């Protein structure tokens, strides 16, 4: 019998996600990856629902548009720069509300600007999310008692994540983005 005749014609069953340098399963101590590795080793493929797949894709490709009204917009620009690079988390800027999933309201919202904010929000496709950034957007901030200031953008549009601070740091906004992704993963698409 030749050596080639003793080899099976079918490849071996996969053993999960294997690190080629060590030969061990990747993150074998993580419960999430243990479940994935066990399913891969058992069946050779993964089974999921379409809703889980859509939620996974949505959290990894959030397109945001700015509604920068004051000094918080500077920190919002900072989060896109190389030091923080929010795009590595799948959070990329867009100029048009029709291409955006997330609106970041940063700064003091006045009564005259409120209809414009609502109009831009209505142009965004569903599902749409709003991050309120800074004390002025959250509750009026320093100008809370002014006759011309809306006391929080949540009186005009529904807000999903509040980022506190005056102005909040870029790290705080980045944390707010990660919280939004966690919220999307938790709630899915149907409940929203």
UniProtKB/Swiss-Prot annotation:
| Gene this protein is translated from | nuoB
- Catalytically driven reaction(s): a quinone + NADH + 5 H(+)(in) = a quinol + NAD(+) + 4 H(+)(out)
Q: Which family does it belong to?
A: Belongs to the complex I 20 kDa subunit family.
What subunit structure does UniProt give?
Answer: NDH-1 is composed of 14 different subunits. Subunits NuoB, C, D, E, F, and G constitute the peripheral sector of the complex.
Topological category with respect to the lipid bilayer: Peripheral membrane protein
Query: Which GO MF terms are attached to this record?
Result: 4 iron, 4 sulfur cluster binding; iron ion binding; NADH dehydrogenase (ubiquinone) activity; NADH:ubiquinone reductase (non-electrogenic) activity; quinone binding
**Which InterPro entries does this UniProt record tie to the protein?**
NADH_UbQ_OxRdtase-like_20kDa, NADH_UQ_OxRdtase_20Kd_su
Which Gene3D superfamilies does the entry mention?
A: 3.40.50.12280
Can you say what this protein is called?
NADH-quinone oxidoreductase subunit B
Instruction: Tell me which residues bind [4Fe-4S] cluster.
Output: 71-72, 136, 166
State the superkingdom. Answer: Bacteria
Q: NCBIfam families attached here?
A: nuoB_fam, PRK06411.1
**Species classification:** Bacteria, Pseudomonadati, Pseudomonadota, Alphaproteobacteria, Hyphomicrobiales
EC number(s) given by UniProt:
7.1.1.-
Pull one GO CC term from this UniProt entry: respiratory chain complex I
Keywords per UniProt: 4Fe-4S, Cell inner membrane, Cell membrane, Iron, Iron-sulfur, Membrane, Metal-binding, NAD, Quinone, Translocase, Transport, Ubiquinone
């Amino acid at each position: 019998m030749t050596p080639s005749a003793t080899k099976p014609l079918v490849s071996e069953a996969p053993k999960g996600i294997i690190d080629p340098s060590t030969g061990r399963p990747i993150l074998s101590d993580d419960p999430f990856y243990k479940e994935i590795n066990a399913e891969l080793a058992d069946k050779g493929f993964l089974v999921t629902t379409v809703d889980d797949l859509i939620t996974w894709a949505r959290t990894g490709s959030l397109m945001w548009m700015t509604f920068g009204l004051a000094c918080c917009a500077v920190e919002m620009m900072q989060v896109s720069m190389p030091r923080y690079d929010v795009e590595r988390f799948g959070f990329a800027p867009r100029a048009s509300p029709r291409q955006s999933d997330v609106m970041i309201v940063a700064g003091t919202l006045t009564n005259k600007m409120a209809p414009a904010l609502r109009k831009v929000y209505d142009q965004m496709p569903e599902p749409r999310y709003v991050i309120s950034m800074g004390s002025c957007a959250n509750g009026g901030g320093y100008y809370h008692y002014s006759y011309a200031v809306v006391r929080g953008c949540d009186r005009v549009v529904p807000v999903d994540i509040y980022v506190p601070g005056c102005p909040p740091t870029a790290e705080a906004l980045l944390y707010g983005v990660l919280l939004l992704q966690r919220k999307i993963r938790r709630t899915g698409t149907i409940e929203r």
